[in-house]
């Protein structure tokens, strides 16, 4: 879903309203690369200091740092594979621009990316290549959804789509069909978002502009909650679970909003803030 949304936003901001290619690459390198390096180093320090509380402890050293950059899925913050994988997708903007100019080229690209998703080799951890090949289909579908205003069409019949997508999603679990599960899950999530927007339009207002910062920071907050629970400072699992979710959302939002207000360029770059 995150990859799909990224593709949607990429088309909206970098294809529909294009900027020069090299400038776009430089912008994405800053927005993805600097937080990637910073949060990798932070994770290495924390996981070394609290090694006894970590499922996957780390160590500090130049060789370890280089390995974590080249093999992000094996690093102390394995979730950062996403930044490397999506970086590959941004680099391919000329291909996306060309293929989206014609329906036959678009259909052929979808077919090719579907084949890559289903049959690409797994286990290539170097620069998250396997992950990039596996998820690029959803990135492209996100761009298609933006180009053809598919979400707007969903809004007309979101209740029907909600029922159909939900039924297909449940069926796909029993059928063990991962691609069908992913596609129906995306449709289900979009329908639920449209439902929420219809009845509770301000539900996501508090953090809608900070989803990237939630992604970057939330894991550290959740690790802290887990450490507190492990040392009996949070005594009930249910309490810890709720605190983990809420803190994982709103602590990053608080940090990002404060940084945005201070408007210190270095901090903004480290947190991936656009300004």
Predicted regions, residues:
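Alpha-helical transmembrane segments and their immediate juxtamembrane cytosolic regions
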Residues: 1-275
């Amino acid at each position: 879903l995150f990859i799909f949304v990224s593709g949607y936003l990429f088309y909206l901001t970098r294809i529909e309203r294009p900027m020069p290619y090299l400038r776009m690459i430089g912008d994405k390198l800053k927005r993805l690369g600097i937080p990637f390096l910073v949060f990798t180093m932070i994770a290495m320090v924390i996981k070394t200091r609290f090694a006894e509380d970590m499922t996957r402890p780390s160590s500090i050293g130049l060789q370890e740092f280089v390995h974590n950059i080249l093999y992000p899925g094996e690093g102390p913050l394995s979730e950062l594979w996403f930044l490397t994988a999506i970086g590959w997708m941004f680099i391919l903007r000329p291909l996306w621009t060309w293929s989206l100019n014609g329906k036959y080229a678009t259909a052929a690209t979808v077919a090719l990316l579907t084949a890559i998703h289903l049959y690409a080799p797994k286990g290539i951890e170097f620069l998250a290549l396997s992950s990039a090949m596996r998820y690029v289909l959803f990135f492209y579908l996100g761009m298609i959804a933006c180009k053809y205003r598919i979400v707007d069409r969903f809004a007309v019949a979101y209740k029907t789509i909600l029922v159909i997508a939900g039924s297909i999603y449940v069926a796909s679990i029993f059928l063990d069909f991962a691609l069908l599960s992913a596609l129906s899950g995306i449709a289900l999530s979009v329908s639920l978002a449209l439902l929420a927007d219809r009845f509770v339009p301000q539900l996501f207002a508090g953090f809608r502009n900070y989803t990237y910062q939630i992604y970057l920071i939330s894991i550290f907050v959740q690790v802290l909650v887990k450490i507190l629970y492990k040392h009996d400072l949070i005594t009930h699992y249910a309490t810890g679970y709720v605190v983990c979710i809420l803190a994982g959302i709103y602590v990053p939002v608080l940090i990002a909003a404060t940084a945005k207000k201070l408007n210190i360029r270095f901090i903004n770059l480290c947190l991936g803030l656009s300004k």
